[in-house]
Amino acid sequence: MILAHDVSGSGPLLVLLHGITEDRRSWDPVDFTDGFTVVRVDLRGHGASAAEEPYDIPTLATDVHDTLAQLAENDVIPGELPVIVGHSMGGIVATAYGALFPARAIVNVDQPLQLAGMQGQVQQAEGMLRGADFPLFIHGMFAQMAGGLDAEELARVNGIRSPRQDVVLGMWRPLLEDSPEELAALVSGLTRIPEDVPYLVITGLDAGPEYAAWLQREIPQAVQEVWQPPTHYPHLVDPARFVERVEAFVR
């Protein structure tokens, strides 16, 4: 699928992937255009992109790759390896991109990759997710993680959020239906990033020392940073710091 997108700036190629239920506008405060050709996309089932099964992570990563390939073929963007930056579920898609396709670097913003804990939480909420209380669950979940955002920015992000039940259920199908062993095998495949591809994790919600050790085993070159204040949105709490850090990491 060719995704809805916008392109701005000039320089090396950098791609921004939003989180689940959001769209590319979530990146509005984060300006990389002084130093990069920036491509922002709406992932499948989000924003202006088509809502069409399947919604598995490898398919979402392939959509991004196909969109970039078409843009490069049409000389809209430079034909070079991209820096892929993903927030939340977009961080998993960015990671999968690095496992499936050549990339210059991967940046994962506040998305743990060891999904066993998330699987338990999602399965406990399965009734709400599949029922009429779906919007209530989604808004409540993100409200708990929005620390650090001022009232204006929180209202902006919430105004972008557009939960589609079929899309969320499709993206979370492995969490709802796979065994723990099947989920672990899926994650193992998605984290097979070549060791010469730099991998940066910026998180506002500390997943703890056991997770940090697990990630170092899965992606040995990973650089992990925990920013304050505690939040799911470190890139929106301090966009200038985020841009500066990513620029320094990939230069």
UniProtKB/Swiss-Prot annotation:
Gene3D superfamilies: alpha/beta hydrolase. GO terms for biological process: acylglycerol catabolic process. InterPro entries: AB_hydrolase_1 (IPR000073), AB_hydrolase_fold (IPR029058), AB_hydrolase_sf (IPR050266). Optimum pH is 8.0. Little or no activity below pH 4.2. Keywords: Hydrolase. One of its GO terms (cellular component) is membrane. GO terms for molecular function: acyl-L-homoserine-lactone lactonohydrolase activity; monoacylglycerol lipase activity. It catalyses: an N-acyl-L-homoserine lactone + H2O = an N-acyl-L-homoserine + H(+). PANTHER family: HYDROLASE, PUTATIVE (AFU_ORTHOLOGUE AFUA_2G14860)-RELATED, MONOACYLGLYCEROL LIPASE. This is N-acyl homoserine lactonase. It comes from Microbacterium testaceum (strain StLB037). The gene is aiiM.
